[in-house]
Amino acid sequence: MLEEKKKQESFEIQRIYIKDVSFEAPNTPNIFHVNWIPTIKLNLNTTTKKIKENIFEVVLMVKVTVKIKEDLVFLCDIDQAGIFFIANINEKRLKHCLYSYCPNILFPYARTCISNLVSCGSFPQMNLAPINFDALYHDHIK
């Protein structure tokens, strides 16, 4: 019985934190008087690092660039990170966990931070749509 417990898959969130964040609005205050028809570009990336046995740092990097015509309205970058304990999972499931499951946990924190920064910059509310990290992961491994 004790042997079975040792081999049981384990996952635990140890910490979620902001590793880096920036907000730039270089064309204020003039941009406030421009007709609000923005183009929004979203870039996502995930990195992972094994800290020690069964302990991993996952960093979800989210970059939002908003322009009106060619003028930069704002640029928002966040590296939302987490430390996760993951044990007794085979390599294939571990990669899925690190590149799909963990970013899925981190994304709501990044989305909230971006929304707050944009609001504090005096721009219209920005609520990023949910991301299907599972689909992104499967597209990446093909």
UniProtKB/Swiss-Prot annotation:
Gene Ontology biological process terms in this record: protein folding; protein tetramerization; protein transport
Key words, A-Z: Chaperone, Cytoplasm, Protein transport, Translocation, Transport
Task: Say yes or no: keyword Magnesium present.
Answer: no
Compartments it resides in = Cytoplasm
Any one Pfam family here would be SecB
Major location (coarse) = cytoplasm
What is one cellular component GO term in this UniProt entry?
A: cytoplasm
Query: Is Transport included in the keywords of this UniProt record?
Result: yes
GO molecular function list? unfolded protein binding
What's the stated role of this polypeptide?
One of the proteins required for the normal export of preproteins out of the cell cytoplasm. It is a molecular chaperone that binds to a subset of precursor proteins, maintaining them in a translocation-competent state. It also specifically binds to its receptor SecA.
Subunit and partners = Homotetramer, a dimer of dimers. One homotetramer interacts with 1 SecA dimer.
Q: Which NCBIfam families match?
A: PRK05751.1-4, secB
Sorted alphabetically, which HAMAP family does this protein's record hold?
SecB
In the record, the note on similarity to other proteins reads: Belongs to the SecB family.
Q: What is this protein called?
A: Protein-export protein SecB
Please name the source species: Buchnera aphidicola subsp. Acyrthosiphon pisum (strain APS)
Q: What is the lineage of its organism?
A: Bacteria, Pseudomonadati, Pseudomonadota, Gammaproteobacteria, Enterobacterales
